[in-house]
């Protein structure tokens, strides 16, 4: 079970939002590179970087910071989302040392882009599905689409994405607990790993997610709980390793 610290970037700073609202942010650090180094030292094997400004702008805004993090941690698996709308952006990130590009809004607006990206960058494409009450949200969560979560996941699984990152918007940044039931339901419906995101708030939830690993839950992204020290990463990694019975790498 992968446990993946989140670094959300807004205005060049490391922030956390509540339910994806850009106006409801908390700044945790003015130095995202130092934050990334901290999580690496604590044992993280993968980092989840989100260009929040880019998600709304439709193109990278905080790319320079992401490049600096990738350069500082050449052995770290880094996944990046936010503002990825064309293959040139994916290529630039991969050339900079990023391991995975997360396609979200573009997948809904132009489904063929996912298939094309999987062919052009095999093994490097993740699908980010952000949902509220089972419906997919796009454009930095500012717009709710008519698309059903599981239907969309099954469609894009066939295109060759490596994994799906599922975020329950209503739980994100609220410290109310990850939606294990919905995450497990999604994981059972497809044959690629699902990475849980949104609301992970305690070690108990980490344990519960690990118990659903056989359903296809391959990891969890942790944000506010780490920054507010509700969860200590090293302790969480030890629990995940013990319950998974194998390395969390």
Swiss-Prot record:
* Keywords assigned: Amino-acid biosynthesis, Cytoplasm, Histidine biosynthesis, Isomerase
Q: Does the keyword Cytoplasm apply?
A: yes
Write down the CDD domains for this protein, in alphabetical order: HisA
Q: Which Pfam families has this protein been placed in?
A: His_biosynth (PF00977)
Which terms does the UniProt entry file under GO BP? L-histidine biosynthetic process; L-tryptophan biosynthetic process
> What EC number(s) would the UniProt record show?
5.3.1.16
Q: Which GO terms describe its cellular component?
A: cytoplasm
Molecular function (GO) terms listed? Answer: 1-(5-phosphoribosyl)-5-[(5-phosphoribosylamino)methylideneamino]imidazole-4-carboxamide isomerase activity
Catalysed reaction equations from the record: 1-(5-phospho-beta-D-ribosyl)-5-[(5-phospho-beta-D-ribosylamino)methylideneamino]imidazole-4-carboxamide = 5-[(5-phospho-1-deoxy-D-ribulos-1-ylimino)methylamino]-1-(5-phospho-beta-D-ribosyl)imidazole-4-carboxamide
| Primary location group | cytoplasm
Q: Which pathway is recorded for this entry? A: Amino-acid biosynthesis; L-histidine biosynthesis; L-histidine from 5-phospho-alpha-D-ribose 1-diphosphate: step 4/9
Q: Which residues form the active site?
A: 8 (proton acceptor), 130 (proton donor)
Q: Which family does it belong to?
A: Belongs to the HisA/HisF family.
Q: What is this protein called?
A: 1-(5-phosphoribosyl)-5-[(5-phosphoribosylamino)methylideneamino] imidazole-4-carboxamide isomerase
Native organism is Nitrosococcus oceani (strain ATCC 19707 / BCRC 17464 / JCM 30415 / NCIMB 11848 / C-107)
Gene of this entry: hisA
């Amino acid at each position: 079970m992968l446990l993946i610290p989140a670094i959300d970037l807004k205005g060049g700073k490391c922030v956390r939002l509540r339910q994806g609202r850009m106006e409801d942010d908390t700044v945790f650090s003015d130095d995202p590179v130092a934050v990334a180094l901290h999580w690496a030292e604590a044992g993280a094997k993968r980092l989840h970087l989100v260009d929040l400004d880019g998600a709304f702008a439709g193109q990278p805004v905080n790319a320079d910071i992401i490049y600096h993090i990738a350069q500082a941690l050449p052995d770290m698996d880094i996944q990046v989302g936010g503002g990825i709308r064309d293959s040139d952006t994916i290529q630039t990130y991969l050339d900079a040392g990023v391991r995975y590009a997360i396609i979200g809004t573009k997948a809904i607006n132009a489904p063929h882009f996912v298939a094309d990206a999987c062919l052009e960058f095999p093994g490097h494409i993740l699908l980010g599905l952000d949902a509220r009450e089972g419906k997919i949200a796009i454009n930095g969560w500012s717009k709710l689409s008519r698309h059903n979560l599981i239907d969309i996941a099954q469609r894009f699984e066939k295109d060759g994405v490596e994994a799906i990152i599922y975020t329950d918007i209503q739980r994100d940044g609220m410290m109310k607990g990850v939606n294990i039931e919905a995450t497990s339901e999604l994981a059972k419906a497809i044959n690629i790993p699902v990475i849980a995101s949104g609301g992970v708030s305690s070690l108990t939830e980490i344990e519960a997610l690990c118990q659903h690993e056989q359903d296809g839950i391959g990891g969890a992204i942790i944000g506010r709980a780490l920054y507010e020290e509700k969860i200590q990463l090293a302790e969480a990694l030890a629990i995940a390793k013990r319950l998974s019975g194998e390395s969390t790498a």
